[in-house]
Design a protein with these regions (language model features):
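Gly/Ala-rich beta-loop-alpha elbow adjacent to hydrolase catalytic centers
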Residues: 89-93, 97
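Active-site loop/oxyanion-hole signature of alpha/beta-hydrolase fold enzymes
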Residues: 42, 46-88, 230, 244
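Conserved HGGG/HGGXW glycine-rich cap/lid loop of the alpha/beta-hydrolase fold
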Residues: 9-59
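Catalytic histidine-centered segment of alpha/beta-hydrolase-like enzymes
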Residues: 230-239
Length: 251
């Protein structure tokens, strides 16, 4: 599959001394990373968020393997054409970033994975595809607000608009094309400092149990922290706490 050029949204100035790339999860968009991007820009960074293939205003394609997402990300470089100071990915965006970083050791200096979907088994795969179909076809702001009354109003609105802006085919194929959804070997091959910021397993997390233990044991460069009381969308549940975990690790 041919890699594509991903559309970008920037916060801060291109001449900033440090550059962060933000990679959204399935059914989201570049704009859904706004709170993280804004916080980095306020600290003097240039924050770039992209629409993954099939999402937002990105080109539509015929395949949506994690390797395809990774190929697109490897074509995504900072405006100064160097490497990223840090790449932050959520869910499948995190898995794709892991694959990209394992393929090109100079792509980014550091990696932050927000509740990464590194391995997804059959039961969870079905939950994901059912949820994506419902979000694309039926989800309303009232539903999101009732389930997440603590979310910022912008996040509520974007939780509804982003999956509808994405290609329904892309949302389905991102699950169906990845019949063996397992990027653990790529995580083990990482050669850069990597932080996993996980959701609370008591709420909902895709990085937990024996899977998380195996990933952490496979690579001493990977560290793990959990934001209590958050689910899979921890950057929406508790954005400030998520940012504090990231910035304290980056120091």
């Amino acid at each position: 599959m041919v890699a594509i050029t991903l559309p970008r949204v920037l916060w801060g100035t291109k001449s900033a001394p440090k550059h962060v790339l933000l990679v959204h999860g399935l059914g989201s968009s570049a704009h859904t990373m706004w709170q993280l991007a804004e916080a980095f820009a306020e600290k003097g960074w240039c924050a770039t968020a992209v629409d993954l293939r099939g999402h937002g205003s990105a080109p539509r394609t015929s395949t949506y393997r994690i390797g395809d997402f990774a190929d697109d990300l490897l074509l995504t470089n900072p405006t100064h054409q160097g490497n990223w100071d840090v790449v932050i990915g959520h869910s499948i965006g995190a898995a794709s970033s892991v694959v990209a970083a394992s393929r090109d050791k100079d792509w980014t200096k550091k990696l932050v994975l927000l509740d990464p979907a590194l391995t997804v088994g059959p039961e969870r795969r079905q939950m994901v595809i059912d949820g994506q179909r419902y979000s694309h076809d039926h989800l309303t702001e009232d539903e999101v607000r009732a389930e997440n009354p603590h979310w910022h109003p912008i996040n509520i609105q974007q939780r509804v608009s982003a999956p509808k802006q994405a290609s329904r085919f892309a949302l389905e194929q991102a699950v169906l094309d990845n019949t063996d959804w397992n990027t653990e070997s790529h995580a083990a091959a990482l050669t850069i400092p990597t932080l996993v910021v996980g959701g609370d397993p008591a709420v909902d997390s895709m990085f937990t149990g024996s899977h998380a233990e195996a990933v952490l044991a496979s690579n001493p460069l990977i560290t793990h922290t959990v934001i209590p009381g958050t689910g899979h969308s921890l950057h929406r549940d508790k954005p400030q706490e998520t940012l504090e975990a990231i910035f304290s690790w980056l120091v």
